[in-house]
Amino acid sequence: MKFVDEVRIFVKAGDGGNGAVSFRREKYIERGGPNGGDGGNGGSVVFVADPQLTTLLDYRYQQHHRARNGEHGMGSDCNGRAAEDMVLKVPVGTLVKDANTGELLVDLSEAGQRWVAAKGGRGGLGNMNFATSTRQTPRFAQDGTKGEELTLRLELKLLADVGLLGFPNAGKSTFISRVSRARPKVADYPFTTLVPNLGMVQYKDGLSFVMADIPGIIEGASEGVGLGHQFLRHVERCKVLIHLIDMGAEGEGRAPLHDFDVLNAELGKYSPELASKPQVVAANKLDLPDAQARLEGFTEALRERGIRVYPVSCATGEGMQPLMDSVAEVLFTGRTEKLHVEIPAKAARAGKAKTKAAEKKALARNAGAAAATKSATKKSAAAKKAVTKKAPARKAGAVAKTSAARKAGTAAAKKAPARKSGTAPVKKAAAKKAPARKSGTAPAKKSAVKKASARKSGSSGKAAAKKASAATKRAPARKSGGGRS
């Protein structure tokens, strides 16, 4: 049977039936009252966890599931028949999620668990329900409601107690076939197992548990290399993980310690919670040549980390019982003492030194980060202050420039009179020199003028004296002449 662990389906509940509009019509009854019946309820879609199923293969090819509708109401007070619910059986451990939002709706992790995914519609009321003392002949009825519909994504997480992890061709299928009745395909090539396999392990004293074998995980599985790590969800419910290491992988260019570190790194990328689960490390294929030599180096490397290694051979069954005893102790009691060993003194000292160095580096990084944050905050504060002070500084600079310009203007104004005053004495001196020059030539002219005036005054004085004497002589004559008359 093909293993399918993820499907997308559409479910729709049935609609409710409509109420009937009917009246009583019988002989000798003239006005019969309303007798329309109610509609039936629609069927719901219900999921049930079935322990007999191990795959979602049935839903891969049938993706639409619709419940039946309720029947309509009829006359003579007859109600419609309600539809039966549609029951969808899924394997135990199925997760039902909303395909649009990815929200987890329910985890069907228990056998027989039921969950109503889509509720059916309610049937409508007939007109007989609307008759009153004032409305004795209602000619209407109520319609049924619609059923719910959803698009769901079903994901299967196998319910196993112990999970088998390892690189491809590490011997996981051989291991589960050795300890249980599971018969997976076993071949000498990688990726023989393409789907998870479950096996029931019968332990001592009637104790039993389920073991899950999943396809191999390789480096880069978180990025889609190989089959990816989509199958890791099948071991998320496991309480214990068995980490199977191939001691014969060096011929393929791999080292056991490298495989161990790579697989744990891929687990951490997928889910830190899964990586923190208890791991039982088993070194497989000890029946191969040179496997014992590789086992010593691998065991010593993990001993320095405090991890115990169980050497086994799945082909011959060597070392299987001590391994299964440790697995059962961790599973049923929760004790993990057998999974660890005492770290050697040198390794412990080296580990302490490494931890101290790592702590110092971490402290230095934290201090550097704190200093960087402080400097960044200081720079940001200084930048903010500079931004706030730039505008006033610019204003002050402008004011200073304007005041300086004004002062320069006043100084220039003051310098202009000074320049004028500086040129004025020159002009005054020139003016003084000009009169001086004029005065130097003026005495000669004045003397000449004085001489001419003296000459004129001398002649004019004589003439004036003559005129005055003549006038005096004439005046008495005029007076006397006037007196005679």
Swiss-Prot record:
Compartment(s): Cytoplasm
One Pfam family matching this protein: MMR_HSR1
Positions of the UniProt region annotated as Disordered: 367-485
GO biological process: ribosome biogenesis
PROSITE patterns reported in the protein's UniProt record: G_OBG, GTP1_OBG, OBG
SUPFAM superfamilies hit by this protein: Obg GTP-binding protein N-terminal domain, P-loop containing nucleoside triphosphate hydrolases
Domain Obg: 1-159
Annotated Low complexity bias: 367-385, 394-428, 437-446, 455-474
Gene Ontology molecular function terms on file: GTP binding; GTPase activity; magnesium ion binding
Protein family (similarity comment): Belongs to the TRAFAC class OBG-HflX-like GTPase superfamily. OBG GTPase family.
HAMAP family in the cross-refs: GTPase_Obg
Protein name from the UniProt record: GTPase Obg
Origin species: Myxococcus xanthus (strain DK1622)
